[in-house]
Regions:
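Chalcogenol-based redox active-site neighborhoods
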Residues: 1-157
């Protein structure tokens, strides 16, 4: 990518396909890659629950979710009980997935893990109905991803 907010082209995504995963959501339910097949999705990595930038981003996505019409999976390295508590405090209409153990394994497989902080980086993936990653965006630490990126890719997928 040439800058922090520019999506990669669909011809040159960062990953060819979304890696396999099996993660618990805020309700303790297992969510797998196979659950996504047949419909497009956004996989949204974020560093931590209960933090202002992450909360603001996810609140913005929650407000836009009905218009986007695409499944959203928000992924952090927080443990599932933390995500459950955050959901009670700030409910959102999508899965909050715990990439806790092996710690950040899914984020690492998606090149969305910060080895220094031990948390996910601000990376989002646009995934088509076949599981192919069509686009990727990453923003700097503390910088929210633009909602327009999701709106554009919702139209393209």
């Amino acid at each position: 990518m040439t800058d922090d907010c520019a999506p990669e082209t669909p011809e040159a995504p960062h990953l060819a396909a979304l890696p396999d995963f099996d993660l618990l959501n805020q309700h303790g339910e297992s969510v797998r890659r196979s659950d996504l097949l047949g419909a497009p999705a956004f996989v949204v990595f974020y560093p931590h629950a209960f933090t202002p930038v992450c909360a603001g981003e996810l609140d913005q996505l929650a407000d836009a979710a009905p218009a986007l019409g695409i499944r959203i999976l928000a992924v952090s390295t927080d443990p599932q009980p933390t995500l459950a508590a955050w959901h009670v405090q700030q409910p959102r209409p999508f899965d909050l997935l715990a990439d806790y153990w092996p710690h950040g394994g899914f984020a690492q497989a998606c090149d969305a893990f910060d080895d220094v902080t031990g948390a996910a980086r601000r990376v989002s993936l646009a995934v088509d109905a076949s599981g192919a990653v069509r686009a990727r965006i990453e923003t700097a630490s503390g910088q929210a991803r633009p909602l327009g990126w999701y709106e554009e890719w919702a139209r393209r997928l």
